[in-house]
Amino acid sequence: MAARNCTKALRPLARQLATPAVQRRTFVAAASAVRASVAVKAVAAPARQQVRGVKTMDFAGHKEEVHERADWPAEKLLDYFKNDTLALIGYGSQGHGQGLNLRDNGLNVIVGVRKNGKSWEDAIQDGWVPGKNLFDVDEAISRGTIVMNLLSDAAQSETWPHIKPQITKGKTLYFSHGFSPVFKDLTKVEVPTDVDVILVAPKGSGRTVRSLFREGRGINSSFAVYQDVTGKAKEKAVALGVAVGSGYLYETTFEKEVYSDLYGERGCLMGGIHGMFLAQYEVLRERGHSPSEAFNETVEEATQSLYPLIGAHGMDWMFDACSTTARRGAIDWTPKFKDALKPVFNNLYDSVKNGDETKRSLEYNSQPDYRERYEAELDEIRNLEIWRAGKAVRSLRPENQK
């Protein structure tokens, strides 16, 4: 990028923007402060009727409702779920993040995984206690009033014939991805007709769900109702969204959640970005640039300097903060990239909506040698020159200097 001096000047600001405030009153502390008193009140008096606030915001001329964490302070959350046991099934990325956040918020949450498997051992390492709040899957479901199915998509499909009969009337079925119910023709996940079925989908990995919660910030999430038997499914979804660590939530449908999620992962979030990284890096190398220069101009400057600023201020601000040369070139080339890429993105959306991506995922991830094949793919990516160069570049960052 031509605006080298501008970029260097902006880097301290990017680091500042990426660092959470040191002095922050966290939701975790609030939950701890009221936990004991709420338990006493729950016995002494019936639950009070609470008014749940909703904020209407303008998103580029479109009015949308947003549900904020402030509408559900710790005392209200604990009171709302005082008669519930949240049975979290699966302890992968989302299970880990959401489960620990629920536990820290003081809710009665238990984990259900295969006994003595890797997830069982991982849960024990995180402080879950066998026989107290760690059980095998069947035992956890039998104890739970809200069953949070956070198994992988493939595992949800494989285990559903066994799990479905245990989702009995009066329970609530919770997902964090619309994959299984939406593509039921492929997954065979037909939900029972006599239970509430809801979704909370954090917009980030389970690690991010956990780290933002611990920083007192909270991740943004979508929520949806697939089936409302009790008339309280929407409120329950919002409350659970806050409980698992959301800072705010916006409403969607199961269909829109899964379409946008699969589309985004394959596009700008990972697949498309990786493809652009590779293409730009390879051209630079073919034109005689060194690995360090090619990586810095392709990945390092983007992730360490520009992307944090775009996230904080928007693309218009980024253009305005750059040199006239960088600005002119970026603006001129934007429509060329858009025109070249839009047909690819339309094909991708079609592939998501018609179920091709779901079929591919289920078939691949259900193979007995899935793990070995995946590790081989990952090893190939790890050994690409771009990422081997990146490892060396990252070692030079000040925070990595010993």
UniProtKB/Swiss-Prot annotation:
Q: How is the cofactor bound?
A: Binds 2 magnesium ions per subunit.
Top EC class per UniProt? oxidoreductase
Where Mg(2+) 2 binds, per the record, is at: 261, 297, 301
The terms under GO molecular function for this entry are:
double-stranded DNA binding; ketol-acid reductoisomerase activity; metal ion binding
Q: Which GO terms describe its cellular component?
A: mitochondrial nucleoid; mitochondrion
What catalytic activity does the UniProt entry give for this protein?
(2R)-2,3-dihydroxy-3-methylbutanoate + NADP(+) = (2S)-2-acetolactate + NADPH + H(+); (2R,3R)-2,3-dihydroxy-3-methylpentanoate + NADP(+) = (S)-2-ethyl-2-hydroxy-3-oxobutanoate + NADPH + H(+)
Q: Give the subcellular location.
A: Mitochondrion
Q: Which InterPro entries match?
A: 6-PGluconate_DH-like_C_sf (IPR008927), 6PGD_dom2 (IPR013328), KARI (IPR013023), KARI_C (IPR000506), KARI_N (IPR013116), KetolA_reductoisomerase_fun (IPR016207), NAD(P)-bd_dom_sf (IPR036291)
What the entry lists under Gene3D superfamilies is as follows: N-(1-d-carboxylethyl)-l-norvaline Dehydrogenase, domain 2 (1.10.1040.10), NAD(P)-binding Rossmann-like Domain (3.40.50.720)
Which positions form the organelle transit peptide? Answer: 1-26
The prosthetic group or cofactor this protein requires is:
Mg(2+)
Residue ranges of domain KARI N-terminal Rossmann in the record:
63-252
Query: Where Mg(2+) 1 is bound, by residue?
Result: 261, 265
| Keyword list, A-Z | Amino-acid biosynthesis, Branched-chain amino acid biosynthesis, Magnesium, Metal-binding, Mitochondrion, NADP, Oxidoreductase, Transit peptide
UniProt keyword Oxidoreductase present:
yes
**UniProt binding sites for NADP(+):** 90-99, 114-119, 152-156
Q: Which residues form the active site?
A: 177
One of its GO biological process terms is:
mitochondrial genome maintenance
Q: Does the keyword Transit peptide apply?
A: yes
Copy the pathway line from the protein's UniProt record: Amino-acid biosynthesis; L-isoleucine biosynthesis; L-isoleucine from 2-oxobutanoate: step 2/4; Amino-acid biosynthesis; L-valine biosynthesis; L-valine from pyruvate: step 2/4
* Highest taxon in the source lineage: Eukaryota
Matching entries from PANTHER family are given as: KETOL-ACID REDUCTOISOMERASE, MITOCHONDRIAL (PTHR21371:SF1)
Q: Which family does it belong to?
A: Belongs to the ketol-acid reductoisomerase family.
Q: Supply the name of the protein.
A: Ketol-acid reductoisomerase, mitochondrial
Write down the species: Neurospora crassa (strain ATCC 24698 / 74-OR23-1A / CBS 708.71 / DSM 1257 / FGSC 987)
